C-alpha cells in the first residue's frame, strides 16, 4: 500500500497532517457523507512515511493512555477480563482481509481499515464521555487523530460506497450496551477498547509498507 505524491514534503507537513481534519468530523454520530465524501478540489496527498508516522504517533498515544489507566501495572495492561465480562466484539483485521503479506490485496485491505476505523468511532466516543480531566483531553485527541486516519485511508479507496458504515440502530444498541455497564467495569472496558485499537493499528501500519 503506497501513498504517493508528486512533490516532496516539508518537515512540518506531519503537523499539517495532524491538523487537517481537527474540525471536519462530528463527535456524536457517524454519517456516510461525514467520512466518505471529499469535495476539496486539491485534496492533500500523503506519503507512506507520513501515514506511517501518524499511525505510530496514534499507537504511542494509546500505549500512554493504557499505562496511565493502569498506573503502569503490567498485569493490568495485559488483562482481558473486560472481554469476558461484556462479550465485546471490536473490529479486528483477519487473515482474509487482504492486509497481510500472504494474500495481500490493497483494495480489500483499504476497505477493511476504513470500515474498521469507522466502527471504532462509537467506542472512542464512549471512552471520551467516561473519562475525566486530562484523560478526557487525551481521549479527545486520540479520537481526532483516528478520524484523520479515516480521512486519509478513505482517499485511497476506489469505491467509497463499499465502505461499511455502522447503522444508526447498531450504533444505538452499542451505545446502550456500553452505557448500561456498571461503574467498576467501565475502566476495564476502556482498556480493552484501547488494546483492540492498538492491535488493529499495528496490522494497519504493517499493511502500509506492502508493495
Swiss-Prot record:
It comes from the Eukaryota. The keyword Disulfide bond applies. Residues 1-24 form the signal peptide. Pfam families: IL6. One of its GO terms (biological process) is myeloid cell homeostasis. One of its GO terms (cellular component) is extracellular space. Keywords: Acute phase, Cytokine, Disulfide bond, Growth factor, Secreted, Signal. Induction: In activated follicular B cells, expression is induced early after influenza virus infection. Plasma levels are highly increased upon exercise, due to enhanced production by contracting skeletal muscles. InterPro entries: 4_helix_cytokine-like_core, IL-6-like, IL-6/GCSF/MGF, IL6/GCSF/MGF_CS. One of its GO terms (molecular function) is growth factor activity. Expressed by dendritic cells and macrophages. Expressed by activated follicular B cells. Abundantly expressed in the central nervous system (CNS), particularly the hypothalamic region. Disruption phenotype: Animals have normal T-cell numbers in the lamina propria but the T(H)17 cells are reduced by about 10-fold. They develop mature-onset obesity and have disturbed carbohydrate and lipid metabolism, increased leptin levels and decreased responsiveness to leptin treatment. Animals have impaired liver regeneration characterized by liver necrosis and failure. Mutants infected with influenza virus do not show a significant difference on germinal center B cells compared to wild-types. The keyword Nucleus does not apply. Disulfide bonds join 70-76, 99-109. N- and O-glycosylated. It is found in: Secreted. Cytokine with a wide variety of biological functions in immunity, tissue regeneration, and metabolism. Binds to IL6R, then the complex associates to the signaling subunit IL6ST/gp130 to trigger the intracellular IL6-signaling pathway. The interaction with the membrane-bound IL6R and IL6ST stimulates 'classic signaling', whereas the binding of IL6 and soluble IL6R to IL6ST stimulates 'trans-signaling'. Alternatively, 'cluster signaling' occurs when membrane-bound IL6:IL6R complexes on transmitter cells activate IL6ST receptors on neighboring receiver cells. Component of a hexamer of two molecules each of IL6, IL6R and IL6ST; first binds to IL6R to associate with the signaling subunit IL6ST. Interacts with IL6R (via the N-terminal ectodomain); this interaction may be affected by IL6R-binding with SORL1, hence decreasing IL6 cis signaling. Interacts with SORL1 (via the N-terminal ectodomain); this interaction leads to IL6 internalization and lysosomal degradation. May form a trimeric complex with the soluble SORL1 ectodomain and soluble IL6R receptor; this interaction might stabilize circulating IL6, hence promoting IL6 trans signaling. Belongs to the IL-6 superfamily. This is Interleukin-6.
Amino acid at each position: 500500500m503506497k501513498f504517493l505524491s508528486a512533490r516532496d514534503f516539508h518537515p512540518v507537513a506531519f503537523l499539517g497532517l495532524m491538523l487537517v481534519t481537527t474540525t471536519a468530523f462530528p463527535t456524536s454520530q457517524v454519517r456516510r457523507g461525514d467520512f466518505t465524501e471529499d469535495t476539496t478540489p486539491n485534496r492533500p496527498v500523503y506519503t507512506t512515511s507520513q501515514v506511517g508516522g501518524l499511525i505510530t504517533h496514534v499507537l504511542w498515544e494509546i500505549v500512554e493512555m493504557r499505562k496511565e489507566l493502569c498506573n503502569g501495572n503490567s498485569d493490568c495492561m495485559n488483562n482481558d477480563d473486560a472481554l469476558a465480562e461484556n462479550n465485546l466484539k471490536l473490529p479486528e483485521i483477519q487473515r482474509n482481509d487482504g492486509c497481510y503479506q500472504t494474500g495481500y490485496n490493497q483494495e480489500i485491505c483499504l476497505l477493511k481499515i476504513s470500515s474498521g476505523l469507522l466502527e471504532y468511532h462509537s467506542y472512542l466516543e464512549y471512552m471520551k464521555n467516561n473519562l475525566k480531566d486530562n484523560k478526557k483531553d487525551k481521549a479527545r485527541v486520540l479520537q481526532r487523530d483516528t478520524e484523520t486516519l479515516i480521512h486519509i485511508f478513505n482517499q485511497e479507496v476506489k469505491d467509497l460506497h463499499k465502505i461499511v458504515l455502522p447503522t444508526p440502530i447498531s450504533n444505538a444498541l452499542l451505545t446502550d450496551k456500553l452505557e448500561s455497564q456498571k461503574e467498576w467495569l467501565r475502566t476495564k472496558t476502556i482498556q480493552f477498547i484501547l488494546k483492540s485499537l492498538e492491535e488493529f493499528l499495528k496490522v494497519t501500519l504493517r499493511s502500509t509498507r506492502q508493495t
